């Protein structure tokens, strides 16, 4: 079996030896149409870079032959997941909160790579609000008074440690 990082086409080589004759390499089987092999060297590649979030395993059969004999072996290529997707907000960009209470709501996000997300806020009213960096729960630092201010604006950033995205709230 082989392992290959997503978003890259290189897989590795099938290796065979014959003392007297040159060898020819071929692929067949379930996912052979997604792979290529150099018929003289056995070097394999994906025809297009794989995406872990679409398909994680490819199966094929490698056949090596000379002018008289052949051997074949089934193999798999396991696609290695990389942190290549930014988080995405799935909650509304607008929250309504009751006067004289600190609760606002929770920002909801998803990450196609399954990474743990952290949250932060910035912007005009960031000093009036807080966000739990692990859960995305938004709160007022002190209960708001409707007669004093009716609207607050912040930018929430969700990060998976490598990629981040923002939403204005």
What is the predicted role of each segment?
Residues 2-169:
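Acidic, turn/loop-rich segments in luminal/extracellular domains of secretory-pathway
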